[in-house]
Amino acid sequence: MDVTRLIDLFPYQLEKFPKSDALAAKENGVWKKYSTAEVLEIVNNLSYGLLNAGIKPGDKIGIISNNRPEWNFIDHACLQIAVADVPLYPTISEHDLKFTLHQSEVRYMFVSDKVIYDKINALKPELPFLEKIYTFNKVEGAAHWTELTEAGKKAPLSEKVNEIRSTIKPSDLATIIYTSGTTGNPKGVMLSHNNLVSNFKACEVLCPFNDNWRALSFLPLNHVYERMLSYLYVYYGVSIYYAESLDTIADNLKDVKPEIFVTVPRLLEKVYDKIVSKGAELSGIKKALFYWALNLGLRYELHGANGWWYEFQLKIANKLIFSKWREALGNNIVAIASGGAALQPRLARVFHAARIPVLEGYGLTETSPVIAVNNFQPDCIKFGTVGTVIDKVEVKIAEDGEILCKGPNVMMGYYQNPEQTAEMIDAEGWFHTGDIGIIEDGKFLKITDRKKEIFKTSGGKYIVPQMIENKLKESRFIEQAMVIGENQKFASAFIVPNFSFIRDWANRKNLKLDTNDEIATNPEVKKRIAEEVNEINKTLGHFETIKRFELLSREFSIEKNEMTPKLSLRRKIILENFKEQYNRIYSFD
C-alpha cells in the first residue's frame, strides 16, 4: 500500500514492519511499549468512542499535553474520522487559550494532567463550544480518556469508521496548528494530509532511516517539526520513545540509546556549555587534552578539507575525548535534527567532529514545516546554512531578499482568516516567509534575518539584529541577547549572562557571586563580557558594532510574554519591560 494520507501510516507500518515497540513511554519507572497492532486497536476504539459520544466529521478536538503515546492515539483517532485536532502548548497564555479554543470551536479537550485540567475547567464558562475535558493522567472528578476506548469496545462502529476513512482525501484538512506570532492574536495554520505526507516523504534524505532504529522524542508534539518527524518515524518503522521530561533527557538517552532525535539549538547550547564547564573542572594533562580536542573540533571542516595531519589528530581526539560525548548520548546517534532557530556554526562543527552529525533545517508551521535541510546525500551539508531545498519544493529570493516558497508543503491557509492568507500567499502561489536569505554555492539556503526585525539607526544604516544576537550567544558567558537601537545613533544590546557558567567561572577566580543580581552588577563580570563583545565587534561592520550593553538579572521568559513558545523574542514587550535599562543606554547625546 502507498501512504497518501496520515491515516495510512500505522496500517502501512503493520503491513511492512510490524513492531513490538512502535510507541513507548515510562510508566512508574518502567518502559511501557505499544506494538503497532495495539496502537491500531486503541486508535480504532477511540474513534468508535468519539463517534458514539456525538463527535462528527468536521468537528475540532483540542490537545494540551506533554509527549506521550496517548497524544498519538488521539491524533490518529481524530484523523480517521475527519476530525481536525488543535494541539496547543502547555505554556499558552490565558488570552491565547481563550482565543484559539473560541475561534476553532473545539468541542472536546484532551489534557495531560490536573494543572492543565484546572486551567481549562476554570475557563469553561467562557467557552460555549467546549463540552467536555478528558485527562490522560487520572484526575479526581475529571473524565479519563479510557472512558472513550471502553465505550468504543462496547459499541464498535467499524463500518462507520471505514465509511468515513474511504471519503478522506489527501487534500482534506488534518490539523489546525496555532502559531503565536511576536505580535497580535495567534493564527490557525490549516495543514492537509498531503501537506504533512509530502513533507515527511521529502525529508527521507535527512539520514538513512532504518526499521531497527529508536528515536527519543522530547520537543513538544504540538511543534510541527517534532510532529512531522514522528510521522516519518512511523513511515520508516522507527520506534518512538518519549522522554519523561526535559529534566530526564540525559538519563533517557543512556537508557533508550536512540539513533536520532530532534532538538532546538538552545538545548544543544546547554549541552555544549555543560560539557565545557565539566572540562574546565579538570586539571593537569586531562584538562589540556580536553581543550586540545575541543579546539580541534571547533576548527572542523567537512570532507577532510583540513588535511591529513588534522584528520590524524581528530582520530586521537575522538578516541580519547569525543567518545565520552557519544556515550552520554547513548552511543548510537546517527543524526540529530535541529530546527526552530538558527544553529551556531561552531556547534555544528564541533558535534560533527565528534561524529555526532547535527543537521540544521529550516521551515515554518505554514510550510509543514521543512523547506530546506542539511542531509546525508553527497555534498548536502554546509555549516552556517540550513541545507538544500527539499524535493518538489521551490524557493526563490525576492528583490528585497525575502525567501519565497512554493510546493505541496504550503498550508491550505489561515483558519477563518482569508485576509492574512492572501497577505502571505500571493496570486502565483508563492508563500512569503518573512525571512531574509541568500542561496550559497548555487544550492545552500542561508537565513540572514527576519524581514520584520531589521531596523534602521538614526544614520539610516540597516541593522540585522538576529545575526548579531547569534554571534553574541556563541560566547559561553552569554545566555540570551537582544540587539536594540532603532532610530538611535548606534546599536546596543540587552545581554542575559549565562548565570550557571559564570558562577563556575567566578568560583575558580574566588569571586563570591550567589545571586543573579550580583552577577549582573559585578564589575568583573561586566568587564569579562565586554571582552567577549569586543571580540564579536571585530567581525561586524562599523555601524553594526555593539557600542553599549546592559546586563540583565533574569532570562527573557514565555511566562512574562517576552518570548513565544518557540522561543522567538517579542521585542516590543522586552523593550517595555526593560525600559529603565534602555534609558540608561540612550540617555545621553
Each language-model region and where it sits:
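Structural core segment of the AMP-binding/adenylate-forming
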Residues: 2, 52-53, 80-151, 528
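Conserved pre-ATP/AMP-binding loop-to-beta segment of ANL
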Residues: 18-21, 135, 153-178, 185, ...
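Conserved AMP-binding/adenylate-forming core of the ANL superfamily
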Residues: 22-76, 93-98, 146-153, 193
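Conserved AMP-binding A3 loop
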Residues: 33-37, 174-200
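ANL superfamily adenylate-forming
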Residues: 115-170, 275-324
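Conserved AMP-binding/adenylation subdomain of ANL enzymes
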Residues: 197-214, 221-322, 332, 357
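Conserved ATP-binding/catalytic segment of the ANL
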Residues: 389-457, 474
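Conserved C-terminal "lid"/linker of ANL adenylate-forming enzymes
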Residues: 455, 480-484, 489, 505, ...
